[in-house]
Regions:
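Blade-level signature of beta-propeller repeat domains, shared across WD40, Kelch, NHL, RCC1
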Residues: 420-450
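Structural motif
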Residues: 40-46, 87-92, 132-138, 174-179, ...
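Solenoidal tandem-repeat scaffolds enriched in leucines and small polar residues
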Residues: 16, 23, 33-43, 48, ...
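Residue position within the beta-strands of beta-propeller blades
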Residues: 29-33, 78-82, 122-126, 166-169, ...
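Multi-bladed beta-propeller domains
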Residues: 1-17, 47-68, 83-84, 93-112, ...
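Conserved beta-strand position repeated across blades of beta-propeller domains
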Residues: 22, 71, 115, 160, ...
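Loop/turn-rich, solvent-exposed surfaces of beta-rich toroidal or solenoidal domains
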Residues: 376-396
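Residue-level detector of Asp-centered blade-edge/turn motifs that repeat once per structural unit
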Residues: 25-26, 74-75, 118-119, 161-163, ...
Length: 450
């Protein structure tokens, strides 16, 4: 027998990315993560009663990503969940009988699954970067305190405990940067920048001779650089923290990037020849995914200081920030003539939008860019190259003059998500893009877990 407890139009993105359902031990309730409405970028935790079909909103996060991974305690009296912003992920608990939220721990890596121990005293959780790279299992008391890294659980996420048995998923993702010659069927795609870890966020220098990118080959996300043929690898940053999204200045002398090294995500600028990074944003709110104005005077970035992600800009020499978008905005680039700002809206809203740099109303230009691929596009003189995943994932060119789209080529493997993934060479002859070339998963069992 099947019963419908809510209709399709009553929820928004319950199964997207971090979607997880959790049954209460007595089977009367279901906890899940969803958007309260389409105007809220952050997800919240909701509780569905199977007896009354009533839905109760439990959390009201003021972060750009929100709450997910709800997990009932063994006695059903307490709910634990993750809360994530651009800066950090925290573990929270709440007594379902009433009371305030309690934050147990926060950190720069993302939460990948929660599991209560049988006695209800501790919570086991996975901690990792995007796509669960550099993961490990940890344990923390339900009252907070210092977490304990378990002796097992390397590359471990999504733990589950039943009795004295613990199972978890061990996952390894391999993302590499590929190169392809445009407008030529004689040159197939080839792997350009690769390792056994994560290589993403490529961007050509203005003269096309160098490529800046982000990599985890050192153990953490850092900025790296190489020649356009993939040779001459050099590590640019050494923050030992989540650092990425490199963007060249128009004159090629500087690189802007974001880093969580200060505790909250901030925008930095470093000389392309090396040296000490200069912090540009100083607010306590997050600042991520920078890009330069065509004249080099401004750096655009995304910030959640208003309660959701919007595009802001700050003088490249330093100074006060000014808000640019007002209806949500994230990864942004100016048009080649500097008249328009193109932008995607981040993790929860699909499409590419445009607003005049002199001010005005926003207009949706492309609707078929998935929300999870906010960094998989590049603006050129007469259009935009972007990833279309409606059928087989492919790179498509949208001509802004004719408003027509042309399929350029199909991807060999799955595209990477939640990361910048595409750049076009200055001479428009070459495209670099990221692919998820390998994703291995194993189910691991630990006996006699205490």
């Amino acid at each position: 027998m099947r019963e419908t407890y809510w209709q399709e139009n009553e929820f928004y993105q319950i199964f997207w990315f971090f979607g997880r359902l959790s049954w209460s031990p007595d089977g009367k309730y279901l906890a899940y993560s969803d958007h309260a409405n389409l105007d809220e970028s952050a997800t919240s935790i909701f509780l569905l009663s199977f007896d009354s079909s009533d839905i109760r909103r439990l959390t009201f996060p003021r972060t750009s990503i929100g709450d997910y991974n709800p997990t009932f305690s063994r006695d059903g009296q307490t709910l634990a969940w993750n809360r994530t912003s651009q800066d950090e992920t925290s573990i929270y608990t709440m007594a379902l009988s009433g009371g305030d939220e309690q934050r147990l721990i926060s950190g720069q890596q993302f939460g990948w699954g929660l599991a209560w121990t049988p006695d209800g005293r501790d919570i086991v959780f996975g901690k990792a970067g995007w796509l669960a790279n550099a993961a490990w299992l940890w344990k923390i008391s339900r009252n907070g305190g210092e977490p304990e890294r378990l002796q097992f659980g390397q590359e471990g996420v999504q733990p589950s405990i039943r009795g004295n048995r613990l199972v978890y998923s061990r996952q390894m993702a391999n993302i590499n940067i590929w190169r392809r010659t445009l407008n030529s069927s004689d040159h197939p795609s080839e792997m350009l920048i690769y390792s056994t870890r994560m290589e993403s966020g490529p961007q050509f220098s203005p003269d096309g001779k160098m490529v800046a990118f982000e990599s985890t080959r050192s153990g953490n996300y850092e900025i790296w650089m190489c020649r356009s043929d993939g040779s001459g690898l050099v590590q640019v940053t050494h923050f030992n923290s989540m650092t990425g999204t490199p963007r060249w200045s128009p004159d090629g002398r500087q690189i802007a990037f974001d880093s969580r090294a200060p505790g909250n995500a901030a925008i930095f600028v470093i000389d392309a020849q090396g040296g000490s990074p200069r912090r540009l944003t100083t607010e306590t709110s997050s600042a991520v995914v920078p890009s330069w104005s065509r004249d080099g005077r401004w750096i655009y970035f995304a910030s959640d200081r208003t309660g959701r992600n919007e595009v802001w800009k700050i003088p490249s020499a330093g100074g006060s920030s000014a808000q640019v978008t007002h209806h949500s905005g994230f990864a942004a680039f100016e048009s080649s003539d500097g008249k328009f700002l193109y932008y995607a809206k981040g993790a929860s809203v699909p499409g590419i939008w445009r607003v005049p740099t002199s001010g005005g109303e926003e207009v949706e230009i492309i609707g078929s860019l998935d929300a999870g691929h906010w960094g998989y596009w590049a603006a050129v003189e007469n259009g935009i190259y972007y990833l279309d995943t409606k059928a087989k994932p492919a790179i498509v060119f949208f001509n802004t003059n004719t408003r027509r789209s042309t399929r350029v080529f199909d991807l060999e493997n799955r595209p990477a998500t939640q990361a910048p993934g595409l750049t076009i060479s200055p001479d428009k002859k070459t495209i670099l893009y990221t692919q998820l070339d390998a994703l291995s998963r194993e189910i691991m069992l630990v006996e006699n877990f205490r």
